[in-house]
Amino acid sequence: MRHTLILSDLHLWQLTDHDDMWMRYRHRQFAPDAQLVALVERVYAQIGSDPLELVLNGDIFDFDIPPVIAGHATPAPSPRTGEQASARLAAILDDHELFIAALVRVLSRGDRVVFVSGNHDIQLSLPEVQECLIARIRSRLPAGFFHNPDSRDCESDRLSEQLQFFPWYYQSADGVHIEHGNQY
């Protein structure tokens, strides 16, 4: 039996330990990464060897939250280009290694990860941003993940089958229509 786990609105952001009261939610202790890892492990304990499809349904990242510069949240416009958004995503990912570990866990087992863009991470529809995330995941996949570690084509083919991006909605193999819903 195939299982689908749908999560949305994690709003991963750059973390800061600065003591601004209005930005306290950005402290590492409030990041949802450890809970996500625990959730994935609980799901795997329940489903055994059945296949899993993890659908990350929008606002997984939050490109609108001010970036951290010199330890402080600094108001800045949302990234508009692939280059700007990739740099922002790389900074976010630097603070969320456990999130990447959870994705690697799912992919390493041969399961799928699907990203659907939301209103706070619409930049995921940009190829440069997708490649930034793919590169981070690829760098942490075990060597045994690839059929032929010397072949980048094999690596890309397998990863592109298991890790997919959709700009608006996703239709699962079981016919379930999944969208973030910010269009309404």
What name fits each language-model region?
Residues 1-184:
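Extended recognition/assembly regions associated with phosphoester-bond processing machinery
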